[in-house]
């Protein structure tokens, strides 16, 4: 089988909006968990989240971002960084031997709610046509394949918290088997109170340390809760 190497990375997270910011946060043991007034107002048990601090419109053209929910927008910014980091030229990115396997736990819940609200108001025309790509199950790959002109393999994997790992593993296999030469792979999800509320209802979120973020969702810490 063919050898597989990683040539470019990109990231948008609560620890930073690019490789260097995230790296420095990790070196300095900085937590990206912050208090959410919105969660408290909606009476969730957990009042904390790890939401990226970024103004999406500063990074993405208006004509591109209108197709995206926040999760896809994070992915777009990360992929832009990965392309630059890899040194790939446009002819390498837009090529029949270059594909994409991207994932998300689900579509943009914010836009699903918007569509539901407009329908209940008996005014569905007000939601507009761009809400479709934001809420498709394949939104993670579809909203990146078009602006980056991906011509090869292109699909979305969704497998809960294992999504990005499965995408990267599948991308590796496609290269090993010689089906694609280059694959862009990863995943993202938006942070929205409605999605959080579902996990909050099953008591899967941290609620013990709402006023002490030091221990909240701290990996490998026996006091985390």
Regions found by a protein language model. Give the residues of each.
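A glycine- and small-residue-enriched flexible loop/hinge segment at structural boundaries
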Residues: 38-88, 102, 137-151
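Acyl-thioester C-C bond-transforming condensing/cleaving domain
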Residues: 17, 28-36, 65, 84-96, ...
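Residues that mark the start of a beta-strand
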Residues: 3, 97-99
């Amino acid at each position: 089988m063919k050898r597989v190497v990683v040539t470019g990375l990109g990231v948008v997270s609560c620890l930073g909006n690019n490789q260097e910011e995230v790296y420095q946060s990790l070196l300095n043991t900085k937590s990206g968990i912050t208090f959410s007034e919105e969660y408290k107002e909606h009476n969730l048990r957990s009042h904390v989240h790890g939401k990226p601090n970024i103004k999406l419109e500063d990074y993405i053209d208006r004509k591109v971002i209108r197709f995206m929910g926040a999760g896809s927008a994070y992915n777009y910014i990360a992929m832009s960084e990965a392309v630059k980091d890899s040194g790939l030229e446009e002819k390498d990115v837009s090529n029949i031997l270059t594909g994409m396997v991207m994932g998300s736990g689900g579509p943009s819940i914010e836009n699903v709610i918007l569509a539901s609200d407009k329908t209940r108001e008996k005014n569905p025309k007000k939601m507009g046509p761009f809400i479709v790509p934001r809420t498709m199950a394949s939104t993670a790959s579809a909203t990146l394949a078009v602006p980056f002109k991906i011509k090869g393999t292109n699909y979305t994997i969704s497998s809960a918290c294992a999504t990005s790992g499965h995408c990267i593993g599948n991308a590796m296999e496609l290269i090993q088997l010689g089906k694609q030469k280059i694959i862009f792979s990863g995943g993202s999800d938006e942070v929205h109170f409605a999605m959080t509320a579902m996990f909050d209802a099953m008591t899967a979120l941290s609620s013990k340390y709402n006023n002490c973020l030091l221990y909240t969702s701290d990996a490998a810490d026996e006091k985390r809760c």
